[in-house]
């Protein structure tokens, strides 16, 4: 009974520490950021899983580092650099995926590496102390400022409006692009629009878990949801809810045990995915 009692006591202590931490603005910002990002991941991540666009999403995430390098080198907000650069690279990768379907993996891999290389070189060439470079790679949810929460909320609204306007069209190109073509839908333009939405979501998620682990938070909740629901709106709702749970649990564990928040969130999500596979079988 003693190990169980110690475990219960440790859990109570962790909960008390989290309740106390909620008094501070940085923790409140972290919770709000988790909710906003989880919503975006559930909505866009579902289409990533349905369309099997995980590799493109990973390429966009890593290529965004080139935009961060541009921001440092030319002395403007690296986040805006990541937005613009990832959007351009996403459209390029989407065009490659549509035009060169047989060789797209290789070409996307080259663009992935190119973006990272540009970012690393520009940061190396930048003079002065670069304090927060690591936060873009590994995430720093506890340092998200309040003004960026408004940016995240705006991006969430943009994604919701986009899906409201083009939901049926996105479904058509996801499940039967040939039928979509016969219905005179602009399949290529719709595909590039979806890729652009992925780029915007990547930059949002980057602030929580970092570029290295962005793709996990985008795909794991949706992949779990896809095993148990077949309706896309339900998949989006479940994926968003799971993302919120993973972020909340990961944030609590990282704060209690002084661990990296981004890595802890992804660890929680990965364990949940493995458990879901076991139950599925």
UniProtKB/Swiss-Prot annotation:
SUPFAM superfamilies: ABC transporter involved in vitamin B12 uptake, BtuC (SSF81345). This is Uncharacterized membrane protein slr2045. The lineage of its organism: Bacteria, Bacillati, Cyanobacteriota, Cyanophyceae, Synechococcales. InterPro entries: ABC_BtuC-like, ABC_TroCD. Keywords: Cell membrane, Membrane, Transmembrane, Transmembrane helix, Transport. The keyword Repeat does not apply. Belongs to the ABC-3 integral membrane protein family. The chain crosses the membrane at residues 30-50, 54-74, 76-96, 106-126, 153-173, 198-218, 235-255, 259-279. It is found in: Cell membrane. It holds the Pfam family ABC-3. GO terms for cellular component: ATP-binding cassette (ABC) transporter complex; plasma membrane. GO terms for biological process: response to zinc ion; transmembrane transport. The keyword Transport applies. Its main location: membrane. It is a multi-pass membrane protein.
